[in-house]
Amino acid sequence: MEGDRLDTLEQRLVRLARKGDTRAFAEIVDLYKDKIFHLAYRMLSNRHEAEDVVQDTFLRVYRNLDRYDETQKFSTWIYRIGTNLCIDRLRKRKPNYSLDAEMNDQEGIDGYAMIPSDDRTPETYLLVSETQKMVHEAIESLPAKYKTVMVLRYLKDMSLQEISDVLDMPVTTIKTRVHRGREFLRKKLERKI
């Protein structure tokens, strides 16, 4: 019932934002900024990149509001945009590092500067138990195609159908990736325990 009210509110805000109401768009941002940040942070494990994804997501939402199909859930549409931006960043992030710290072909840049930082906050370390930490590390090490579905399924509590809608893939593909993702996790965690 609350989901229906939220959908109605979102639909109303989208209609107003399409007409140029900046306050309505600001409310959309308020409704989703934390959700998109958590999704992006779980997928990218980098606070700064997650913040960039949030900004890019809302920029794309604003530019493409006229393309949003009101027969679909707004949350699915915005999660798809955020997820796709994360996937794009993960693809671009493929490591291409030299074993040597100093690289002669790039002035002033050494190999250490190219390694992405791990910007986890102290409160994150306090909140995460040892077991959760191991699971999180195992999820981080998953290949991107499994990591995405595992984050959406287990950390964002999305149904298989919702994940299918967000990633624009058949439900059977999502089921397969969830199953294989679980197998990867099981094998990684068995080695650690």
Segments (PLM) and residue ranges:
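Arg/Lys-rich amphipathic alpha helix in sigma70-family domain 2
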Residues: 66-70, 83-101, 180
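Internal acidic/polar
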Residues: 6-7, 96-125
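Structural recognition of an alpha-helix C-terminal capping motif at a helix-to-coil junction
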Residues: 38, 52-59, 72-84
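Sigma70-family region 2
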Residues: 18-19, 45, 58-73
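Short helix-capping/turn signature of helix-turn-helix
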Residues: 31-34, 42-45, 132, 151-158
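Short amphipathic alpha-helical boundary/capping segments
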Residues: 12-16, 134-143
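Short, charged helix-capping/linker segments at alpha-helix termini
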Residues: 2-4, 18-27, 37-56, 162, ...
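DNA-recognition helix of helix-turn-helix
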Residues: 76, 87, 134-138, 146, ...
